[in-house]
Amino acid sequence: MGGDWQELAQAAVIGLLFAFLVAKLISTVIAFKEDNLRITRSTPTSPSAADTPAAPAPPPASLDGGHGDTSDGSGSDSDSDWEGVESTELDEEFSAASAFVAASAASGTSVPEQAQLQLYGLYKIATEGPCTAPQPSALKLKARAKWNAWHKLGAMPTEEAMQKYITVVDELFPNWSMGSSTKRKDEDTTVSASSSKGPMGPVFSSLMYEEEDQGNDSELGDIHVSAREGAIDDIAKHLAAGVEVNMRDSEGRTPLHWAVDRGHLNSVEILVNANADVNAQDNEGQTALHYAVLCEREDIAELLVKHHADVQIKDEDGNTVRELCPSSWSFMNLAN
């Protein structure tokens, strides 16, 4: 009898647990459905409201009491506007100055060469910027002088170069601005003399735009070309064939000048051993030793000195090799 009651009690407990679990499951399902229904039935945003663009926000009040809109941006940008005006005026004055100089050159006005070089360097900085061109050969004296005038100005600002250019023109021609092309009266006549030379006119055509002779082979003897190229076998053949070792080109340069300028030490040795005149001067009065110093070829200079090159010979500018050479070249102090 007691065993029956225990079985009945166990069955009742199990039934209650089962009923509790079922009820819990049902309540969970119902709650989940209610949540879904709540989400689905939530009121959407009105399409008309969503599609209507928001009115633009009113501009903030200006700090000057509401008068900001009447300034047309002239308040904060006034400095940059003035800079633009100043830059334009400087450009025009520089253009007028360079055009005036071009016209002066065309009319044959004489200007010191040093001033020409100064104008050239400033013009190149103003129109092209810092010098990046390779240094010309020492054989090209004018080209070398122009390159130095440009190169020594370094990274000078364009505006500064323009202003200095104008200052030099003012010093050379105090009254040039009286007929300046900044007034745009006779500009067409002035610019026509220079328009084919550059965007703002040349400095002095005789210096700035002179085409330098680059050693045209048609103007050189075969031995000059061989010395220039460092072709030692060809040099030996020319000498063996009886070619004059001191043969001059149109500029008075000997094969030794060419070999030194191009830095061909072996060619220099062959020529000096063939009794080349180490003191021969070109049309500018420069010897092969001048070339060695100007081109900073110390080993060749020392070789020439050993072959009794004269360090006291002056070129047309009155410069001796000893005056031009670096102080570190001690062998120069022992020469002659």
Swiss-Prot record:
Induction entry: Induced by salt and drought stresses. Down-regulated by cold stress, wounding and infection with the rice blast fungus Magnaporthe oryzae.
Alphabetically list the UniProt keywords: ANK repeat, Endoplasmic reticulum, Glycoprotein, Lipid-binding, Membrane, Repeat, Transmembrane, Transmembrane helix
Q: Where in the cell is it found?
A: Endoplasmic reticulum membrane
Q: Which InterPro entries match?
A: Acyl-CoA-binding_protein (IPR000582), Acyl-CoA-binding_sf (IPR035984), Ankyrin_rpt (IPR002110), Ankyrin_rpt-contain_sf (IPR036770), FERM/acyl-CoA-bd_prot_sf (IPR014352)
GO MF terms listed in the record are: fatty-acyl-CoA binding
Extent of Acidic residues compositional bias? 78-88
| Tissue expression pattern | Highly expressed in leaves. Expressed at low levels in roots and seeds.
What are the binding positions for an acyl-CoA in this chain?
A: Y120, G121, L122, Y123, K124, K142, K146, Y165
Question: Keyword Transmembrane helix on this protein?
Answer: yes
Checking Pfam families in the record gives: ACBP (PF00887), Ank_2 (PF12796)
What is the annotated role of this protein in its UniProt record? Binds medium- and long-chain acyl-CoA esters with high affinity. Can interact in vitro with palmitoyl-CoA, linoleoyl-CoA and linolenoyl-CoA. Binds phosphatidic acid (PA) and phosphatidylcholine (PC) in vitro. May play a role in the biosynthesis of phospholipids.
Q: Write the protein's name.
A: Acyl-CoA-binding domain-containing protein 4
Q: Which gene encodes it?
A: ACBP4
